[in-house]
Structure formats: structure tokens, C-alpha cells
């Protein structure tokens, strides 16, 4: 998922641990994102950080699209996998969403099972696997026959089904955050979608245009600051 919004903050949090739990951190990066990833990584890594390196790959391919030498080295090592790569566009076509979110997760699971000294899979799901259910949804409830608003929700649901089918052979922790927003203190974010899209739209309206409540003006929004999420993931993980 690097250099994505959540993954970059997760890497930063892991590097700030003292001591860092990992001797080496390997970041799988799409080829088209390599230059951006290199710049982002240079901002995060200091001289006393553990080894952090980028590996070009593709989660939809066997061995996650890595070079054979990289795949072999990781199979021999004692590793944990953090799987954050996904397509989040709520208007994404079904075929693309399925290929990235479901097929990609299956390839991650395949690779995990092929590792000789595999430790744990950390799978970042979403609270929206609950779909159109109402009321309280508990962590041990996944498939309740629910419907979904879009292909993002449905494919993340199917991806989590794939993860749960194999967690007897693959030790797994599943995280289901809500809508992830910027830092709770600074507000820093690189995102422009979700609630930010609506807020930016409202801010562009002329100041003399009256604000009108549409729908339930007192409704709650399921959001979580990225620093809270990442700190929780590091603590739980």
C-alpha cells in the first residue's frame, strides 16, 4: 500500500518505535509509483532507522509480482505481512474492484502460505463490510446476508471472506476502520475524497449562499483520524 496515506503513516509509526520490532521493512510498490515512493520514503527514513527498501510488485500477480530473488528471500525469512493495498474509489467498476481487492488479497494469502517462517498477516479491512446493515455490528459478524452500496464495499466484504477462510493456516489480525481522515492534531492529510470532497465543495460556494440542512442535520459520521488508527494498529499488532 505504500506510498498511500495510511501506509506511509504506519511505516512512520513503526520506525518511531524504540526499538523497532522489525530488522527490515520491505515495501511493495507499483512500478508506476516507484519515483513517488522513493521521495516519500526519503522523508521518513533517518540514519538510525532499520533497513527499509522498496520492492516493485503487483498484488494481483503470483508472488505479488516481485522479482524471483526478492520472493525467494522473503520466503526464507521470518516475516509478517501488512496488507493495506486496495482500491478505495466508491465509483470503481466491479471488475477492477474485484481484481484488486479480492484477487489481490488471494495472492497475498497465497504468498503468506508459501513462506516457511510466516508470523502474522495484518489485514486492513473496513467497517463497511457491514454494508446496509443497521444497529450494532460485532467483530465476529461478517456474512449476515447484507446488501452493499457500491463495489468497494462488496469487494472488501468478499476479500475479508477469503481471509477468514484461511486464518486457521495463516495467523491473522483484521482491522475494520471507518472513513480515515487527517491527523487529529494537525489536520494533515493527502486525501481529497470522502468528507473532504464535500467540505471543499461547500467552501467554494459564495459566502452569501445560505447553508441549508439536507437530511438529518444531527447525523453522526463514522470517521477516524489517521494517527488514532495507526497507533491502534501498532498497539494491537
Go through each PLM region and give its residues.
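N-terminal Rossmann/SDR dinucleotide-binding element
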Residues: 1-87, 94, 115, 120
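C-terminal, well-structured subdomains that either form a transmembrane helix-short loop-helix hairpin
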Residues: 2-3, 10, 101-107, 218-237
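Short, well-ordered alpha-helices that flank and scaffold nucleotide-derived cofactor binding pockets
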Residues: 12-16, 110-114, 165, 200
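Conserved Rossmann-fold NAD(P)-dependent oxidoreductase catalytic core, especially the SDR/UDP-sugar
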Residues: 80-84, 91-99, 103-154, 172-174, ...
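Conserved catalytic Lys-bearing alpha helix of Rossmann-like short-chain dehydrogenase/reductases
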Residues: 102-108, 155-163, 198, 229
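A structural motif corresponding to the C-terminal end of an alpha-helix
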Residues: 51, 111-118, 159-171
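Active-site loop/turn elements of alpha/beta-hydrolase fold enzymes
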Residues: 30, 59, 126, 177-180
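NAD(P)-dependent short-chain dehydrogenase/reductase
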Residues: 135-136, 149, 165-221, 226-235
